[in-house]
């Protein structure tokens, strides 16, 4: 099954990261092209005027697929040259497709958004979070260099100092701190998040 599901409700596209048994981890073979295909379908449908991105199950996205990293498979397989290609053809395709989406994109962060998952959320124009959500860019804790574009984007969202603090410490922050820092716009109870995201999407689509 595709990593990204697409549902259309009138002028709104709902895109759902769909690997709930792995907290929507990303980086398996084919994830990049799958996300690109969904984004292309959204752009091709001129009746779609806004999109909402969320995660299936209890997480938005736990980030890169650590199991695939350990097994050296998917985007993380092979020799260093191959890993570079895996990032270019898989991970980078995911973030570029979302960042370059031609309609406004809202991230409805329904749970943990960690590492690549946090950076994927940041590709949206607007970020809303459930009150229990956690966000962090924890690459250094895994001995990784942030390589998905988030290190470029994060300082532009929350400022250089706070971005450096998150990147250098690997700290995970709660939704209230994320709102205080400007990483998310609004916080809602978990059972209200998607409803509020849809209300906002409908307002945007109506402009």
Which residues fall in each region the model found?
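Acidic, divalent-metal-coordinating active-site segment for phosphoryl/phosphodiester hydrolysis
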Residues: 115, 171-177
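Glycine- (often His-adjacent) and acidic-residue-rich active-site loop
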Residues: 22, 55-97, 113, 143
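Conserved CoA-thioester-binding segment of acyl-CoA-metabolizing enzymes
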Residues: 1-56
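Glycine-rich beta-to-alpha active-site loop
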Residues: 58, 92-142, 146
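Hydrophobic, secondary-structure "cap" segments at the distal end of domains
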Residues: 152-161
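C-terminal long alpha-helix characteristic of the crotonase
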Residues: 128-133, 161, 175, 184-207
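Charged catalytic carboxylate motif
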Residues: 30-34, 90, 97, 196
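Hydrophobic/aromatic residues within transmembrane alpha-helices
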Residues: 15, 53, 65, 120-121, ...
């Amino acid at each position: 099954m595709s990593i990204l599901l697409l549902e259309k409700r009138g002028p709104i596209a709902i895109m759902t990261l769909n690997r709930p048994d792995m907290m929507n981890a990303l980086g398996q073979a084919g994830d990049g092209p799958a996300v690109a295909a969904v984004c292309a379908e959204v752009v091709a449908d001129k009746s779609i005027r806004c999109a909402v991105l969320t995660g299936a199950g209890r997480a938005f996205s736990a980030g890169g697929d650590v199991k695939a990293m350990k097994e050296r498979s998917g985007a993380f397989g092979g020799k260093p040259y191959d890993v570079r290609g895996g990032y270019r053809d898989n991970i980078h395709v995911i973030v570029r497709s979302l960042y370059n989406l031609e309609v406004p994109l809202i991230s409805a962060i329904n749970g943990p958004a960690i590492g690549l998952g946090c950076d994927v959320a940041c590709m949206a124009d607007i970020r809303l979070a459930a009150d229990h959500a956690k966000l962090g860019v924890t690459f250094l804790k895994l001995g990784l260099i942030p390589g998905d574009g988030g290190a470029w984007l994060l300082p532009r969202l929350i400022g250089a100092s706070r971005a450096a603090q998150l990147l250098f410490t690997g700290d995970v922050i709660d939704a209230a701190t994320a709102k205080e820092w400007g990483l998310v716009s609004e916080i809602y109870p978990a059972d209200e998040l998607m409803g509020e995201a849809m209300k906002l999407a409908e307002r945007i689509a109506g402009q």
